[in-house]
């Protein structure tokens, strides 16, 4: 028995000595052999609910890339290593319910996604019942956050974009009147127009601040009558919500008439496909649009955050300096940054309940890649926004709107 003890002790000493040969200090040895086992329990799950496959998978790619890029920059949340756990909703409503339940069973501290408001709405009851906070990335349907106190978003809804463009007309352009040209029967366009009008009337104290308001049929080809009516009003800014194909057609026809008017649109105009639809006679002075992120242009100090620099550096390293990050990628990045930050602000072992409490705090605020971000009581963001134009095949910010309630 004594001989056996000697053999065991000798073996332990031999193993420790061998390990120490590769470690210059005891701290290195401790990190290599002791802390490794302890760290395996210091892991926190951030769930990702996205259409990895199916018809929407291509559209969701930038959201996912943004999340993954942020994870590479910030692999830890406080003292815990983040484990990204994906659940594929397969671009299907029924599959989303299963994917959400599967993800919830993993007990994530927070969930990110999904691309497509319809999928987030399908997952919402399960997320609400599990009391797990979630952050949608590009969902513009107001019901995503309105019907679930645990759901947040990092993008503006359509009506918010109308409000932002109203601020731009008054603050940036110093104008007191504007017009609206929108498609019939488009609820999102109507919500955007209503918010635009409210902002102008409020800021100018003028009930007649919307001097032109007219509707057209989606897919309409000739806008000569509408454009001539706009000319007669003398307004210099026209809100143009709706499909960007119609918007591009209207802007092109207005340019042919040499109209001294700037058309204002939503974030869909940042898509390169919109730029390609514009006629050769259209200049950057003919239109502006809202963007959630800007890599260059007229930026305020609120927009130039440390996280923005980290994001751009990581993006350029991964995708090259010649390319430009999309809004969706920057928003996906920020959704992860908020999740990791909220986890890091908890005490003790993080869980969904603690993270939900952090995000529900009215004083919660963070500087993300897209600027300053906090949330209102519904879970929608109060954040920096950018008024942008296409210049030399790239988007360039011409006016920054600081976060405002």
Feature names for model-found ranges:
Residues 48, 103-116, 135-137, 179-183, ...:
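Periplasmic-binding protein-like
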Residues 315-330, 340-394:
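Segments of small-molecule ligand-sensing domains
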Residues 255-331, 390, 394-403:
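Extracellular/periplasmic periplasmic-binding protein-like sensory domains
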Residues 32-66, 74, 87-93, 116, ...:
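Extracytoplasmic "Venus flytrap"
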Residues 127, 193-293:
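Extracellular/periplasmic bilobed ligand-binding domains
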Residues 88, 143-168, 213-215, 281-293:
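Short beta-strand elements at the ligand-binding edges of bilobed clamshell
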Residues 25-34, 43, 58-65, 73-144, ...:
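Beta-alpha junction/loop-to-helix N-cap segments that form part of ligand/metal-binding clefts
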Residues 151-218, 236-237, 339:
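An alpha-beta-alpha
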């Amino acid at each position: 028995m004594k001989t056996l003890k000697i053999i065991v002790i000798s073996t332990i000493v031999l193993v420790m000595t061998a390990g120490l040969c590769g470690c210059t200090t005891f701290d290195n040895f401790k990190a290599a052999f002791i802390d490794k086992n302890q760290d395996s329990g210091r892991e926190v799950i951030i769930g990702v609910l996205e259409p990895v496959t199916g018809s929407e998978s291509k559209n969701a790619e930038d959201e996912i890339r943004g999340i993954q890029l942020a994870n590479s920059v910030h692999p830890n949340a406080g003292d815990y290593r983040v484990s990204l756990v994906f659940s594929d909703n397969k671009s299907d409503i029924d599959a989303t319910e299963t994917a959400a339940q599967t993800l919830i069973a993993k007990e994530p501290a927070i969930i990110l996604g999904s691309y497509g408001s319809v999928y987030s709405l399908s997952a919402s009851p399960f997320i609400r019942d599990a009391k797990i906070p979630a952050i949608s990335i590009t969902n513009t349907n107001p019901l995503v956050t309105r019907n679930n106190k645990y759901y947040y978003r990092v993008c503006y809804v359509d009506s918010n974009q109308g409000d932002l463009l109203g601020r731009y007309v008054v603050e940036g352009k110093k104008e007191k009147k504007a017009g609206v040209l929108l498609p019939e029967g488009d609820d999102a366009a109507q919500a955007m127009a209503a918010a635009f009008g409210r902002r102008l009337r409020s800021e100018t104290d003028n009930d007649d601040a919307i001097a032109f308001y007219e509707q057209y049929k989606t897919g309409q080809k000739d806008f000569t009558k509408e454009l001539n009516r706009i000319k007669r009003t003398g307004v210099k800014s026209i809100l143009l919500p709706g499909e960007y194909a119609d918007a591009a057609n209207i802007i092109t026809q207005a340019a042919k008439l040499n109209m001294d008017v700037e058309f204002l649109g939503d974030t869909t105009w940042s898509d390169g496909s919109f730029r390609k639809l514009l006629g050769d006679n259209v200049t950057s002075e003919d239109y502006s649009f809202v963007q959630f992120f800007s890599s260059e242009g007229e930026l305020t100090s609120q927009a130039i955050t440390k996280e923005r620099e980290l994001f751009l550096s990581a993006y350029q390293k991964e995708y090259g300096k010649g390319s430009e990050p999309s809004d969706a990628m920057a928003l996906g990045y920020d959704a992860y940054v908020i999740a990791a930050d909220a986890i890091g602000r908890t005490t003790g072992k993080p869980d969904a309940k603690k993270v939900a409490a952090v995000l529900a705090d009215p004083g919660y605020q963070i500087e993300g890649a897209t600027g300053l971000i906090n949330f209102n009581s519904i879970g929608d963001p109060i954040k920096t926004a950018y008024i942008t134009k296409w210049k030399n095949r790239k988007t360039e910010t011409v006016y920054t709107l600081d976060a405002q309630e």
